[in-house]
């Protein structure tokens, strides 16, 4: 019966996102027309006219689909509500973390639309908000006795980190959010790679004994599949910082809530590659005064080498599948 709950969450996530996309795509197109020309991002003329608040579709539809899916699961198996592993508590904390990061992304997108802040929120306030969201998630996990104190390392087993664990988890959440933010630019890549990650997260939660909590990645996978109807190249709607940070919140908070925070590394491999390339570019330029790469992040580098939007999409999705394979191999 729990399998039915996962299917219901996935189908509902798809249907709600498709319906919201039909409503929001023309609405956001109209809002984008009121944005002054000098505030447009330095992209191609076609890209600059693509509205970037589509992440709201993902946030709203996933939240509703998870609610329906979890209710169906609890009706089929009432013991989930009083489980010793605190399944409902962990699910609510993961949802809270994802929504909190998504709200920060929404503020970032709103800053682009309402002011002359071409790049959105300033760096320090944005990092402070992300750190606050990460701290809130960690505090909630610690208060409920769900915060992992170590991590699994290949060949070394479980390694206790003690008091350093919360600091490391917080850094991972903030770094993942920043990396995901840099990935919004190429049509379809964020949603395509996140879809592969959600499929992997469902399989991993099933394998690790957290099958009921797979309702969240199931709902989001359905929502992402529907969102690709507008986000596949050429995109008519982009997730924006709202969608990117929301997806980063899910990829960071769900593994953390089930005690396997290290899974965020392989599952979010495309995001880490995008953000890591930007970091290397900045550091190398500051040290030598010359760029290390022809362009950064990764999708810009591929475009600079002549790859078209569809080719970039497939390359990034292939990298996401590689990360999925690494994560599955990691838990064997």
Range-by-range predicted roles:
Residues 54, 137, 251, 277, ...:
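Alpha-helix boundary/capping detector
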């Amino acid at each position: 019966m729990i399998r039915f709950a996962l299917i219901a969450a996935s189908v509902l996530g798809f249907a709600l996102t498709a319906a919201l996309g039909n409503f929001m795509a023309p609405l956001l197109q109209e809002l984008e027309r009121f944005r002054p020309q000098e505030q447009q991002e330095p992209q191609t003329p076609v890209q600059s006219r693509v509205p970037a608040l589509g992440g709201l579709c993902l946030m709203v539809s996933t939240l509703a689909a998870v609610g329906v899916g979890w209710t169906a699961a609890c009706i089929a198996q009432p013991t989930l509500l009083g489980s010793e592993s605190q399944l409902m508590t962990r699910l609510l904390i993961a949802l809270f973390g994802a929504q909190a990061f998504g709200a920060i992304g929404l503020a970032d997108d709103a800053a682009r639309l309402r002011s002359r802040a071409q790049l959105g929120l300033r760096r320090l306030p944005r990092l402070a908000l992300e750190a606050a969201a990460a701290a809130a998630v960690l505090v909630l996990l610690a208060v409920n006795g769900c915060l992992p104190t170590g991590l699994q390392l290949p060949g070394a087993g479980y390694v206790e980190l003690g008091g350093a664990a919360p600091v490391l988890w917080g850094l991972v959440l903030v770094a993942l959010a920043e990396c995901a933010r840099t990935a919004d630019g190429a049509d379809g890549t964020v949603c395509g790679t996140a879809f592969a990650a959600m499929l992997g997260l469902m399989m991993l939660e099933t394998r690790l004994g957290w099958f009921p909590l797979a309702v969240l990645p199931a709902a989001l996978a359905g929502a992402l599949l529907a969102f690709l109807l507008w986000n596949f190249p050429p995109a008519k709607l982009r997730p924006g910082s709202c969608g990117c940070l929301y997806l980063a919140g899910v990829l960071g908070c769900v593994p953390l809530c089930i005690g396997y925070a290290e899974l965020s590394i392989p599952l979010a491999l495309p995001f880490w590659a995008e953000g890591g390339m930007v970091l290397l570019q900045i550091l190398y330029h500051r040290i030598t005064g010359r760029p290390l790469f022809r362009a950064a992040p990764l999708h810009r580098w591929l475009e600079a080498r002549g790859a078209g939007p569809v080719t970039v999409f497939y390359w990034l999705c292939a990298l996401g599948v590689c990360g999925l394979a690494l994560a599955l191999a990691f838990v064997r």
